[in-house]
Every structure is written in C-alpha cells, then in structure tokens.
C-alpha cells in the first residue's frame, strides 16, 4: 500500500483523514477507505507519543482555539519528510490526532477544521510526490561524479535505519 498514491485525490485524502478521526469499529472500517482504519489505529496506539510532541499546554492548541492555522501548519509542513511509508503514515496519524484533539471551544467550526488541516497537508504531499518523481526520472548521468565516498556511506547508513514503522527509533 502506497499512502501517497492513495492520497493523490484531495477528496479521497480528506475522507481518509476524516475517517481516521472516528472511533474504531464497523462504521470506520466499512464507511471509509482501509487507510483510514490503519491511520486511526496508529493514532490510538501512539497517542501518548503525540501528546509528548504537542502537550495540552502547548501554544499550538491556543492558536487553534483562536482560529489561526496558517503559521503553525507552515512550520509543521516545511519540515515534513515523507521518504518512506512509515513517515507517511505517521504524518497522516498526526493530522488525525490534531483534528481529534482540536479545542472544542475553538472559533473554527468542526466542518471547517477538516479543510484547514487537509488543504495545506494535501498540497505539501503533492509537492513532495512530484519532487520525488522528478528525481527518480532523472538520468543516472546527472548523478555521476557527484558526492564522495563518505557521503555515499552516510546515505547507506541512513537507508539501513529506514523503516516502514511510523515510529522507528
């Protein structure tokens, strides 16, 4: 399963994120894409880690309460790395976590929250996917003579640590 491929269509992506915010059970499994159930299960399993990243006292929640989302999402999305399936699933789960825990007294209606989260995230995913396709389509001759042996060894070491587990330590 390639999460980025599945999320190419905005409405599908939006539906997956929305579905992942529902409690586990028959409704989530049958009403939404299978990826919504996977993402929802990750959120439930790793919720403690998400709370460590963004504790209840974090200013992000106050910003969301006030309806300001552009600056926080810009900061979150610019550092986004989606090299492998684990990171992709972790990112989708983090979006679901934010929506599940959005302050109920926020000036933003529940309907608008989904699009405030999904629109910039989907745009970033599309940019990431396009860049990855362009790099993969480059001829090998472009890369000849670039990089040193040390850089290649570091790259191999990074790949050795790469995992599909969304929270690989």
Curated annotation (Swiss-Prot):
Keyword match Magnesium: no
Sequence segments annotated as region (Disordered): 147-169
Keyword entries, A-Z: Early protein, Host-virus interaction, Inhibition of host apoptosis by viral BCL2-like protein, Modulation of host cell apoptosis by virus
Tree of life domain: Viruses
Compositional bias ranges of the Basic and acidic residues kind: 156-169
BP GO annotations: symbiont-mediated suppression of host apoptosis
Any Pfam family the entry gives: Adeno_E1B_19K
Family: Belongs to the adenoviridae E1B 19 kDa protein family.
Protein name: E1B protein, small T-antigen
Organism: Canine adenovirus serotype 1 (strain Glaxo) (CAdV-1)
């Amino acid at each position: 399963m390639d999460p980025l491929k599945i999320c190419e269509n905005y409405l599908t992506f939006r539906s997956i994120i929305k579905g992942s915010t529902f409690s586990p059970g028959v409704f989530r499994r049958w009403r939404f894409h299978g990826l919504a159930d996977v993402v929802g299960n990750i959120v439930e399993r790793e919720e403690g880690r998400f709370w460590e990243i963004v504790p209840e006292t974090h200013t992000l929640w106050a910003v969301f309460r006030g309806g300001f989302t552009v600056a926080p999402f810009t900061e979150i999305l610019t550092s986004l790395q989606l090299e492998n399936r684990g990171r992709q699933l972790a990112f989708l789960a983090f979006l679901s976590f934010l929506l599940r825990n959005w302050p109920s007294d926020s000036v933003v209606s529940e309907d608008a929250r989904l699009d405030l989260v999904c629109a910039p995230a989907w745009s970033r995913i599309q940019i990431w996917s396009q860049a990855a396709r362009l790099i993969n389509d480059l001829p090998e001759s472009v890369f000849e003579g670039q990089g040193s042996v040390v850089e290649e060894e570091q790259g191999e070491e990074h790949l050795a640590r790469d995992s599909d587990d969304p929270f690989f330590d």
